[in-house]
């Protein structure tokens, strides 16, 4: 039987191993989840489920430091950023605990056919396939709305964060959720495909790579199952000539280095107006070069390791290929010698459309910088991408910012702020960044049977 290993990317030391789930265990988990869906837990009144979410939020808060430390050791996130991730998880749980009942109230529709309304009901067992970069937050985005609604979930987490997956499942059970409400499975891609094909599974949610999303969408489509996908992003950070440059640089550094750049909504393509480009690049380069690399548990560290040796090696290959095809290195550009999976903060300029890097997502501390002459060119460059997840625009003229935000082809745009997230706001993208929305009132309705009822008269 294969195992899932927890390895500290700061020093490459093995922390612990978990055995994978065999076919019998997966079959049993599906049986339990399906039975629970057909019970009063899912079909009955909502308050008992909301009480579990309230308890879960309290548990997360009470064990915040423990949870943050586990994540930082397992995937290399700075301890302060892990604490922030844990905090947003309790916020999401509380948001749905406090708002789900109102959101799911029947909605009236005026009609000549009679009294009409739409009710919201759970649809059944879901499969969730989630990544390692936010090992709790990604799970909570699926758990909280679907637990409130009454769907049951079988979760396949990324294989490099088994400890986070295991402790999350235990927290859900400790909060009072019955067996089958949320089940963690250490399984293969083939086993995921088999689950999606099972008639008892009614939907699948995936956050991950474009390749993984395409495979899941194909399998879901083959069996006519609802799916939502949150995939890669190549988000823009547009700095116009009237922007608060110091603040744009400060947040630009955060937006590129947070989680060692391993964020779908991280700023990756910096589009600068030519009037401020040289000043921005100078300040930005100095700030990136001043990053303190080290142990993510050390409060003084400002840039931790990449999540794994594979992640580091992919980034090395990407940057080397970009430079070989004409990109210019302003700073950085190499892996850091010694133990751990560290990579230098890097700026690339001079990337042309014939360079493969032009359309690639760099999942690490690498910033692509482009210079444009006007707003129209900024929008054209921003939209010349296969992806459409998020982005930000920096300007003192809010009307100008609104115009650009409306024209940029993404699911989310922030004006005078780096991309962010909050439980009450929808999260999702367009193009190859996926489809569907998570969080907010939209997220809880993705896997709901939106049932029309009409009383003729």
For each predicted feature, which ranges?
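Short, well-ordered beta-strand elements within core beta-sheets of diverse protein domains
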Residues: 15-21, 37-42, 128, 237-240, ...
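Rossmann-like NAD(P) dinucleotide-binding subdomain of oxidoreductase/dehydrogenase enzymes
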Residues: 105-247, 372
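ALDH superfamily catalytic-core signature
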Residues: 176, 211-352, 415
């Amino acid at each position: 039987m294969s195992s899932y290993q927890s390895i500290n990317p700061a020093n490459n030391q093995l922390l612990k191993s978990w055995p994978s789930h065999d076919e019998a265990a997966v079959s049993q988990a599906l049986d339990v989840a399906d039975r629970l869906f057909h019970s009063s837990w899912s079909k009955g009144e909502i308050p008992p489920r909301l009480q579990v979410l309230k308890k879960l939020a309290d548990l997360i808060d009470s064990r915040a430091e423990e949870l943050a430390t586990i994540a930082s050791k397992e995937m290399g996130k700075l301890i302060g950023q892990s604490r922030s991730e844990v905090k947003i998880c309790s916020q999401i749980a509380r948001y749905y605990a406090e708002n789900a009942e109102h959101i799911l109230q029947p909605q009236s529709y005026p009609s000549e056919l009679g009294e009409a309304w739409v009710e919201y009901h759970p649809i059944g067992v879901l499969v969730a396939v989630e990544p390692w970069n936010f090992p709790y937050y990604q799970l909570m985005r699926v758990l909280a709305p679907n637990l409130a609604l009454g769907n049951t979930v079988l979760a396949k987490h990324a294989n490099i964060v088994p400890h986070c997956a295991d402790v999350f499942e235990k927290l859900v059970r400790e909060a009072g959720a019955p067996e089958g409400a949320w089940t963690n499975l250490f399984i293969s891609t083939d086993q995921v495909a088999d689950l999606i094909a099972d008639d008892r599974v009614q939907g699948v949610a995936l956050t991950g790579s474009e390749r993984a999303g395409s495979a899941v969408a194909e399998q879901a489509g083959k069996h006519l199952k609802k799916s939502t996908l949150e995939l890669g992003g190549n988000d823009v950070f547009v700095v116009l000539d009237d922007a608060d440059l110091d603040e744009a640089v400060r947040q630009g550094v955060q937006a590129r280095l947070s989680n060692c750049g391993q964020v779908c909504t991280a700023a990756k393509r910096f589009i600068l107006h030519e009037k401020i480009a040289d000043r921005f690049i100078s300040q930005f380069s100095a700030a990136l070069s001043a990053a303190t690399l080290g142990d993510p548990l050390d409060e003084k560290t400002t840039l931790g390791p990449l999540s794994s040796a594979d992640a580091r090696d992919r980034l090395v290959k990407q940057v080397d290929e970009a430079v070989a095809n004409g990109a210019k290195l302003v700073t950085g550009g190499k892996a850091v010698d010694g133990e751990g999976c560290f990579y230098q903060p890097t700026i690339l300029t001079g990337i042309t459309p014939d360079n493969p890097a032009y359309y690639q997502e760099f999942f690490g501390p690498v910033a692509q910088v482009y210079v444009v002459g006007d707003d129209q060119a900024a929008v054209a460059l921003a939209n010349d991408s296969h992806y459409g997840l998020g982005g930000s625009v920096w300007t003192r003229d809010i009307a100008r910012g609104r115009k650009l935000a409306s024209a940029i082809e993404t699911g989310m745009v922030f004006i005078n702020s780096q991309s962010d997230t909050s439980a009450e706001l929808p999260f999702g993208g367009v193009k190859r960044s996926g489809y569907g929305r998570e969080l907010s009132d939209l997220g809880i309705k993705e896997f709901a049977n939106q049932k029309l009822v009409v009383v003729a008269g």
